[in-house]
């Protein structure tokens, strides 16, 4: 079931239940889509204004990219649920079954893929929001700051859905490769999100 077709209230109700999905990954994707949309809104409030005519084409291009990012992020909500299914089934295999370790290992790697992709999309979103914050309408700059803060939270949340799985991998080389990629994104784009927030906030105290 694609929870993105449900109401906000329905999504939250199911999220709070004992259903296996949506979980942290799906919630991260939805939150990232919301943060991206806030940045995109800044673009929508910039286009068509004479004051920003010199950056209009750049803003339009960013809006188109964000439209795509929003759609991709929403697609990750059901994708994350689907990615968890093999892992749930693997845990159900009797511990004395000789096939269990290999099946569990493969399922664990599969379960990492969607949250890692969510992180990658969050990074792309933050790059866009940085430009919206710097060049978009000053009347909506707070929304760019909000978007950056929200997408950062989604980035961090998605990373935990990777780390909980890499911790259990027997192939430590694969685990460390995934961890390094995620930690790199957290470091670089966590700092970018903080810079956006700090710059936007500072502008209100000048």
Model-identified regions with their sequence ranges:
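Long, charge-rich low-complexity segments
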Residues: 79-91, 193-206
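A structural-propensity feature for long, helix-poor, extended segments
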Residues: 50-89
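Amphipathic alpha-helical coiled-coil segments
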Residues: 59, 66-73, 115, 122, ...
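Amphipathic alpha-helical interface segments
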Residues: 80-149, 153, 165
């Amino acid at each position: 079931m694609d929870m993105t077709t449900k109401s906000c209230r329905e999504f939250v109700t199911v999220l709070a239940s004992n259903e296996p999905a949506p979980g942290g990954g799906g919630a991260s994707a939805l939150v990232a889509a919301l943060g991206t949309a806030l940045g995109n809104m800044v673009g929508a409030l910039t286009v068509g204004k004479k004051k920003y005519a010199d950056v209009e084409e750049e803003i339009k291009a960013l809006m188109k990219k964000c439209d795509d990012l929003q759609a991709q992020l929403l697609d990750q909500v059901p994708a994350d649920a689907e990615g968890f299914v093999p892992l749930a089934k693997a845990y159900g295999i009797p511990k004395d079954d000789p096939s269990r370790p290999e099946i569990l290992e493969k399922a664990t790697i599969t379960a990492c893929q969607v949250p890692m992709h969510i992180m990658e999309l969050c990074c792309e979103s933050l790059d866009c929001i940085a430009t919206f914050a710097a060049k978009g309408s000053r009347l909506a700059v707070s929304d760019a700051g909000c978007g950056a803060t929200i997408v950062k939270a989604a980035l961090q949340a998605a990373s935990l859905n990777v780390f909980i799985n890499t911790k259990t991998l027997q192939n430590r080389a694969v685990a460390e490769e995934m961890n390094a990629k995620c930690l790199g994104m957290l470091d670089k784009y966590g700092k970018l999100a903080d810079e956006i927030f700090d710059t936007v906030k500072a502008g209100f105290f000048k």
